[in-house]
Amino acid sequence: MVRAKWKMVVSLILFMVSPGDGLFHAVYRSILVSQSFKGDAGQPLFLSPYIKNGKIKEGQRKSMVSPFPGMNDKSYAGYITVNQTYNSNLFFWFFPARMQPEDAPVVLWLQGGPGGSSMFGLFVEHGPYIITSNMTVVARDFPWTFTLSMLYIDNPVGTGFSFTDHFQGYATSEDDVAQDLYSALIQFFTLFPEYAKNDFYVTGESYAGKYVPALAHYIHSLNPVRKFKIRLKGIAIGDAYTDPESIIGGYAAFLYEIGLLDEQQQKYFQKQCSKCVKYIKEQEWMKAFEILDKLLDGDVTTGSSFFQNVTGCTNYYNILQCTEPKEQSYFAKFLTLPQVRQAIHVGNQNFSDGAEVEKHLREDTVKSVKPWLSEIMNYYKVLIYNGQLDIIVAAALTERSLMAMDWKGSRAYRRARRKVWKIFKSDNEVAGYVRRVGKFHQVIVRGGGHILPYDQPMRSFDMINRFIYDRGWEPYNS
């Protein structure tokens, strides 16, 4: 039944596109890629020299990834140098859309963290592959790569396979993050000029709620004055940690209302959150970070966080799960296989858990990028989505942030009524809820948590395609 409906979605989209460490680091910190492996992993492929010297065809040919057994997806991978002084390099893995790649939008995916590898998004959420416990590669039923050309980048420098040779090569602000990503994108579209004419979207989840607006703002600012213009059409952010102040201020009440805190625990949590917000207002960034870390994450705190102690759970990504699903970490072992490393051109380069990235971005953890998001909402298509079951950036906390934003549609947004969203008219199940004002779409997806495409792959697939291809939110005929 599900496959039949999936075929219906695909057929509709075929017609549609035919011509005419921080706060959210725990899930990534638990994914450890061993640096010990046997066999020939090949050599890292650095593509910037090919780009600089105009050897485009050779660079494309060298970056092509050998297909995995049973798979036939075309893809390209390698390193782009974004700072020669510090030898800072960003790793990318690019999948042209299976369907009409010559016209399909190019979608950049950025994982959160800070320090979470976008390989998590590729293997766990919406890439073409799923890794099983015995290291078998199987095809995903609802890959975003079916209709979209997906560009996965390990970001910032020092995340996953991305690396730098100097401590000054690490980002310490969102400006640094955006600058490195912009450099990578300009080089990427030079290496793959056939995709430079296509619409471009910046997407991500969680802490990427900072990266995405930062990069979009950077592109928006530079496009008018640069010869090469990136065809930015919009952004999409899942469970967006964009404005920490408004989110943190709502934690205690939300956790109490869903039964994870009792009355006394709520009072303590609220007191600490209020203190954290006070420090944010005073720009005492490290003091605010330390309070938040002790309350929620426990990355630099000795022992468990307050949240972990009182709930008994390490997983704050889905209210129905107390620990992280084991299958979310299978890809880590896969990335140690020498034949895989050789195929994606990383050689014996270490895979970082992002701890050093988080260290350099600690002050950034509690800073807001709300002005940049407001700017983007004034000019481009924007999708902000939440999983109904998320805890750490819950739908209610996102709405708390959105209600506090000032953009040209803010008044209309506050008055707008949300509508029920179903994928098919015959569905008994509701996929979620949508509130739309102009080019802005806010979506809550039922039955999913923070790692939404993992929990609800079909609904996520439908959502991203409705948004990017402007299909609206009316249900399809069965």
From Swiss-Prot:
Name this protein carries in UniProt: Probable serine carboxypeptidase CPVL
Function (record text): May be involved in the digestion of phagocytosed particles in the lysosome, participation in an inflammatory protease cascade, and trimming of peptides for antigen presentation.
Superkingdom: Eukaryota
Keyword terms, alphabetized: Carboxypeptidase, Glycoprotein, Hydrolase, Protease, Signal, Zymogen
Family: Belongs to the peptidase S10 family.
EC id: 3.4.16.-
Protein's UniProt keywords contain Glycoprotein: yes
Entry annotated with the keyword Coiled coil: no
Any one GO molecular-function label of the UniProt entry: serine-type carboxypeptidase activity
Source species: Mus musculus
Signal peptide residue numbers: 1-22
Lineage per the UniProt record: Eukaryota, Metazoa, Chordata, Craniata, Vertebrata
Enzyme active site: S206, D390, H450
Xref: InterPro entries: AB_hydrolase_fold (IPR029058), Peptidase_S10 (IPR001563), Ser_caboxypep_ser_AS (IPR018202)
One Pfam family this sequence matches: Peptidase_S10
Enzyme superclass (EC): hydrolase
GO BP: proteolysis
Residues with glycosylation annotation: N83, N134, N309, N350
